[in-house]
Amino acid sequence: FESLKADYYLSLDSENVSQLKVVEKFVAVFPEYDQNRGIERAIPTKYKKNNLDLKIESVQNEYAIDRNYTTYESNDNLVLRIGDADSYVRGRQVYTITYTMRDVITFYDQQDEWYWDVNGDQWRQPFGSVTARIHLAPDLAVSISKQPICFTGSYGQNATDCSVSSAKEGDQTVITI
C-alpha cells in the first residue's frame, strides 16, 4: 500500500454511549498485469465483551463513486471484499471506506480508554505511511488526562516510532498520529 489515512470522529450520544464514525482512505498500487481483483478489509465487530454495532455507510473510489463489495464474517470481524470477481485492477487505486460503531470506549474505575489498531496486523503488504486523525467532541476532549500514545510494529511489539500532536479545529480537538 502507498498509504492509509484514517479519520475517527469520536463522541457520546444522549445516553453517554460512545459513537465512532470512521473514514479510511487506502491507496493501493497494483501491478500492471492481471493479478488482483481488489482488496479485503477486516473490521472488528466486537471489542472485549462489547458488540460494536458496526454499520458500513459506503465504499467508494477516489471520485466518490461506489465500489462493489461483498461481506463475510470471520473471527469477530466483518470482512469487506472490495472489487469485482470478473475484473482485475491495475495501478494506483483508492478505496474509501466509511462506517460507524457504538460502545468503543472501555470504562475503568480510574480512567476510560479508547484503544484502536489503525491498520491491523494481518496485511500481507506493507504500508508506505499510516496517518490517523482522532476528532474528539468537546465533551470527550475535556476528559483527556494523559498524553495520547501510539505504538508501531508487528503484533506484540511496543515500539513508538510515531509522533502525536493535538490541535483545536472548531469545537473539536484533533489528535494526529
Stretch-by-stretch model annotation:
Residues 1-177:
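Lumenal/extracellular ectodomains and adaptor appendage modules
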